[in-house]
């Protein structure tokens, strides 16, 4: 089943993310580790700044997919 969902919005040269998770998966942990953010255990938010975190807006989807996979699976694939 779905453990975490991420809503993505472009806003003035940065990417804003809104993260929601089910009990047992920390939205806050993911936001703090990969998205310069934080919040509550199952509802958090963050951002990706261009070019500090990603080279351009077009790189956001790949970054989010890769780092969410790392967070949820504890690996680097």
Q: Predicted segment positions?
A:
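Glycine-rich, acidic loop segments that terminate in or are immediately followed by a histidine
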Residues: 1-77
